Amino acid sequence: MATLQIPSALLRSFLLMFCLFVIPSLSSDSDPLQDFCVGDLKASASINGFPCKSAVSASDFFYSGLGGPLDTSNPNGVTVAPANVLTFPGLNTLGISMNNVELAPGGVNPPHLHPRATEVGTVIEGSVFVGFLSTNNTLFSKVLNAGEAFVIPRGLVHFQWNVGQVKARMITAFNSQLPGAVVLPSTLFGSKPEIPNAVLTRAFRTDDTTVQNLKSKFAV
C-alpha cells in the first residue's frame, strides 16, 4: 500500500503556523521577559502593558484596596474595586489582577463578560448566587457561601447576585493584568453613539417605547 508523503516544505509551513497561532493562544497576557516591570502610568500603554518605571521600591508591589467597606448605594447595589494594572502598577506584565466586589442585600453585579481573562471568585462574606452562560445558552450556577469559589471561563456572560439578608463580599482573580469588562445592559442601552432603536427592538422583540425607556435609564 502506498504511503502518503507530505512535502517537507508544507510540513515546515504547518509547524510554523502552529507555533505562531496555536501556542500563544494557550496563555492570556504575554509572558514577562524580566523579573518585573512596574508600570509607568504616565506613559502610553503598549501592546504588552506599560513601559517600566526606571526606579522602583517595595511600595510598588503593595496594594491596600482590597479591604472594605464599599459604598453600594447605587441602582444595582454593587461596587467593584479593581486591583488591576491601572490601580496597582506592580502587576504590569505579570498577567494577574483582582477585584474586591461588595453587594448589598439583593444587589446584582449585572450580566457582563471579561474578553481577556478567565475569572475565579471566592466569597468572603455572605451568600452569592453566581452563574455563567455557555455558548449554547446553558446556565451553570451555584449559591456560594464564605470560603467557596466558582470559575468563570474566559469571555462568557456571567453575573453575581446577593441572595442573603446581609451584605456579601467576594474577591475575584483574573489571569490578565487588565481583563476588561463589557457590562451588557449599559453597553447595549447606554452606548455613545446610540445603537439604533430598530436594531434593539428587533433583537429583543419589543417596541420602540420600551427601548427608549431603557436607554433613558442608562443615559450618561
Swiss-Prot record:
- InterPro entries per record: Cupin_1, Germin, Germin_Mn-BS, RmlC-like_jellyroll, RmlC_Cupin_sf
Q: Where does Mn(2+) bind?
A: 112, 114, 119, 158
Q: What is its main location?
A: secreted
Task: Cite the PROSITE patterns for this sequence.
Answer: GERMIN (PS00725)
Q: List the disulfide bonds.
A: 19-37
GO MF terms, alphabetically ordered: manganese ion binding
From the Swiss-Prot or TrEMBL record, state where the protein is found.
Answer: Secreted, Extracellular space, Apoplast
According to the record, which residues are glycosylated? 136
Cite the Gene3D superfamilies for this sequence: Jelly Rolls
Task: Give the superkingdom in one word.
Answer: Eukaryota
Q: Quote the Pfam families the UniProt record gives.
A: Cupin_1
Provide the leader sequence positions: 1-27
Asked if the keyword ATP-binding belongs to this entry, the reply reads no
Question: Which UniProt keywords are present, listed alphabetically?
Answer: Apoplast, Disulfide bond, Glycoprotein, Manganese, Metal-binding, Secreted, Signal
Kindly give the SMART domains that the UniProt entry links to this protein: Cupin_1
Q: Which GO terms describe its cellular component?
A: apoplast
Q: Which PANTHER family match?
A: GERMIN-LIKE PROTEIN SUBFAMILY 3 MEMBER 3
Q: How does it associate, per the subunit comment?
A: Oligomer (believed to be a pentamer but probably hexamer).
Q: Which family does the similarity line name?
A: Belongs to the germin family.
Q: What does this protein do?
A: May play a role in plant defense. Probably has no oxalate oxidase activity even if the active site is conserved.
Q: What is this protein called?
A: Germin-like protein subfamily T member 1
Species this chain originates from: Arabidopsis thaliana (Mouse-ear cress)
The protein's gene is named: GLP1
